[in-house]
Amino acid sequence: MRRIDIRLGLALLLISTTLAAAELPLERIKLPPGFAIELWARVDNARQMALGHHDDKGGTLFVGSMQAGKVHALSFGANFRVQAVTVVASGLQRPVGVAYRDGSLYVSAVSRILRYDDIERRLAQPPAAVLVTDRLPGETHHGWKFIAFGPDGKLYVPVGAPCNICEPDPQRHANILRMNADGSGPEVYARGVRNSVGFDWQPQTGELWFTDNGRDLLGDDRPPDELNHAPRAGMHFGFPYCHGGNLADPEFGARHSCAEFTAPAQQLSAHVASLGMRFYTGTMFPPEYRNQIFIAEHGSWNRSRKIGYRVTLVRLQGSKAIAYEAFASGWLNGENAWGRPSDVLVLPDGSLLVADDHAGAIYRIIYRR
């Protein structure tokens, strides 16, 4: 009887996903030749994605959310098709960020980091949360955050400025923190970071790269969003004094010269709301994509003509950015957006997942040789 129930559940999931795909105009998405996009799963308010345990039989993807207050687990098989979607946490305050380490799921919830142990063995009856830390700032303005473990084993946690533009305590806000997995030993890794969301480590060097969202109310085309490179601790990236490496802030810029700070590795378009980013480490895509950066641009809210709502590609030569271009676009139709990319993640088969919190979807981009 249980085998019949499982088969019925998988059939219903396939039917519901097929029907949902018909409701989303995926034919509008423009990709380079040879690429294709499909609906992979429906997940309410999907934000950061983190890959759990996986092997040749399948694995688990964890997905955070904002307004939904939930964390989902997506179980997929050897063919990388989703078999089940399970809510593993709910009722949390903006549990946007998710990270996985040694069988445990870590979740950010504004001022707190929570841990769910032995999670994949307990998806049907998730464990109680263990408090890792509750000492992060409680402001919700830029208070939600992605999280991830670095190559040094530390948990990295961006803490945004609690404002559009202000001069906050640099030990408390506008920085990127790192701490031990148990929450001990927190330290500021990078300063002058207004609102970083996505970050990843370059495969060849192990060095940190991250997106940062520029301030508002300086017009349609300034300041730029930023892609930054932090090869070592202690660097300052300019906020609130300097934006984009060369634009002095009209309120705070007189206090420091832009020359005092680290300029972005790549200026991104103004107000695109650059969120999740990942280095492409797969082998499915052509070789020229290997170790390049994909960025989910959530899209503008404060511009006379909307911009963003796409996935972009930053091409690198070593550790130098040499090009910034659209990779997947079409979620914006004129001034109407039907989707908003929020994160990207490379599956073990080399396909690229794109989370969309507006459409409540996760897409899968594949390359057909």
Feature locations, PLM:
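Beta-propeller domain segments
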Residues: A22-P33, D56, W144, A161-N164, ...
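Beta-strand-rich domains and repeat architectures in extracellular enzymes and scaffolds
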Residues: E38-M66, V272-F279, I295-A296
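Surface loop/turn motifs at the tips and blade-to-blade linkers of beta-strand repeat domains
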Residues: L39-D44, T86-G91, V132-E139, V188-G192, ...
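Hydrophobic core register within WD40 beta-propeller blades
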Residues: M49, V98, I147, S196-F199, ...
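Conserved beta-propeller blade signature
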Residues: K57-V63, S104-V107, K154-P158, E207-T211, ...
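Short loop/turn segments immediately following the C-termini of beta-strands
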Residues: S65-Q67, V110-R112, D118, G160-P162, ...
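Asp-box/WD-like beta-propeller blade repeats and closely related beta-sheet repeat scaffolds
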Residues: A99, S111-G150, P158-P162, G185, ...
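Blade-level signature of beta-propeller repeat domains, shared across WD40, Kelch, NHL, RCC1
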Residues: L345-R369
